[in-house]
From Swiss-Prot:
The active site is at S348 (charge relay system), D468 (charge relay system), H498 (charge relay system). It holds the Pfam family Peptidase_S15. Homodimer. The gene is pepX. InterPro entries: AB_hydrolase_fold, Galactose-bd-like_sf, Pept_S15_Xpro, PepX_N_dom, PepX_N_dom_sf, Xaa-Pro-like_dom, Xaa-Pro_dipept_C, Xaa-Pro_dipeptidyl-ppase/CocE. It comes from Streptococcus pneumoniae (strain ATCC 700669 / Spain 23F-1). This is Xaa-Pro dipeptidyl-peptidase.
Amino acid sequence: MRFNQYSYINFPKENVLSELKKCGFDLQNTANHKDSLETFLRRFFFTYQDTNYPLSILAADKKTDLLTFFQSEDELTADIFYTVAFQLLGFSYLVDFEDSDVFRKETGFPIIYGDLIENLYQLLNTRTKKGNTLIDQLVSDGLIPEDNDYHYFNGKSLATFSNQDVIREVVYVESRVDTDQKGLSDLVKVSIIRPRFDGKIPAIMTASPYHQGTNDKASDKALYKMEVELEVKLPHKIELEEPQLNLVQPQGQAELVAEAEEKLTHINSSYTLNDYFLPRGFANLYVSGVGTKDSTGFMTNGDYQQIEAYKNVIDWLNGRCRAFTDHTRQRQVKADWSNGKVATTGLSYLGTMSNGLATTGVDGLEVIIAEAGISSWYNYYRENGLVTSPGGYPGEDFDSLAELTYSRNLLAGDYIRGNEAHQADLEKVKAQLDRKTGDYNQFWHDRNYLLNAHKVKAEVVFTHGSQDWNVKPLHVYQMFHALPTHIHKHLFFHNGAHVYMNNWQSIDFRESINALLTKKLLGQETDFQLPTVIWQDNTAPQTWLSLDNFGGQENCETFSLGQEEQAIQNQYPDKDFERYGKTYQTFNTELYQGKANQITINLPVTKDLHLNGRAQLNLRIKSSTNKGLLSAQLLEFGQKKYLQPYPAILSARTIDNGRYHMLENLCELPFRPEAQRVVTKGYLNLQNRNDLLLVEDITADEWMDVQFELQPTIYKLKEGDTLRLVLYTTDFEITIRDNTDYHLTVDLAQSMLTLPC
């Protein structure tokens, strides 16, 4: 384990002493260090009647147990302090470590022995081997009462609200959209779990079209066959209009009642970060949105009608919209428990909705935590004029996603009444998708949140993985740079795939978010501020560094690609084409081994480099016909240890999200030997070689100069490493599979790779 502590806040000494005293650690600033440590430890072991026993089973050094040490005349030393501290954090002395000073350096332990009271205070705020901070572990065990009131420690809310005796209710928010054109505003179901409290509390909201269930069978039937020819497009410039949103006004009167009338029972799933905040005094709201089970309307996936309906939930929390007790719309209930302040959470589609909500500039949305969220839907299902699929899901497109998320069809009555209209709406969607050309058009323009990024007022926290080929890193990169300069923005850029990171051992993500939300939603005045970029170092396990920016580098490193011309044959023998189509993983393996139709160029790294931004290929290229699909991947090549893209379980159900509440696995990205690691990749329709909005002819056998930017990333390379550039046509995981007989030729002498460093 390595310690990477970003959540700790430096407080004045008087605050430290006061907070310690409130937790029963009655330490005196004038006492000697040894006496203070003993006083601290006897309170620490509050679950024991006889505190001599737990002291006797800890060690001060290799020859002395801690009780014997306290009974001796020996002085407290730095070595003894560290030895005790590591044991309190769950490390076994003489098993996990033998020399505390060596272990301190190996783990990057954040505490430097000096002022003992401040050391002990920071120790309580440090994560244990099993994933909780020490103070959270003690609170979970009953250090302070579960009194349904707020208690703070180091600028973070503690788990002092009951997660057993909570209010579980359902309301139906009246949205400002009428997606199915029935002349009535759509209703959106809101599932609420909130702690009991006499005053007003903030809300954690997760906007998830998946929450009420998904129609997997209908979605699977809607998948597309990827084996189609690349379309030869007519040259033209794409014209677009400003997206429009038509809102509807509230209708009718509704009796105001004191409380919701529908009780929330079982929910399909919760997000463990939300579970963590519930006993800390934050309401949990789960909203599936229009077109989902128990709500009304069509599934409009990604457009501002869908976003508006989610926004209206925040409006209700602030008294600007109504919520009914049921579908009759006869009785309404106010969110009189809400302080109006909201943070949004969730990954993938959930993080996408956070991005979209932020771009409305809605009052009350204080923080978004957008994890692996889409910023422009075109870049999810298309790329540079090509029809593509999100990584791992070949054949998926917008209409199959609509079938997946239109969970109203899971209710037989809704299916009978509404499926015909839903299918008619889907036909319109299919026509607008333009799966034939892969071009950007008005349909995608209406689902581009970057156009409204200037409206964002909330503080923004992103998480994204360098190995996320589902929602590719371009999404967070573009959103990060499109945000107004005056707002606070932060990015946790890890080396995983499309995954959550709130339960990783190496980073205090939950505690950092706690510090942020306690400040922004609960009004605690602290100077807590996350760095702009927190980046997971790819060269070592469990190592995180603070960076000033993502991209925007002034310097670059250029690699020439060779001296000759090389060709990429597009067509495969039928046997190989069928084999790769059945299992794209086989294609990826053979591509990395140099066995596919490809140009492979090994590039020695002659000095240490820190890639930060978008690698760019400048290629002189020609096609043997009037079309061309170009794929590129940049690998670090060579057998060595690399971080793996999916977290592994270190210990099962050891993270406590409250007081024995929603126990969670502790995980981490493994660091183990592999033959290569993907650094970045990209895909390009050569007819869109100069601009996404400009379609140009390709003349057979005529040279073209192409500037091709790959996916943004942050990646460290060392002198002696090897980069491998792979150029090819069809990618059996991502692109359409055109097996026509043509080839691309690259003049390597007139081509180069540029890395921003």
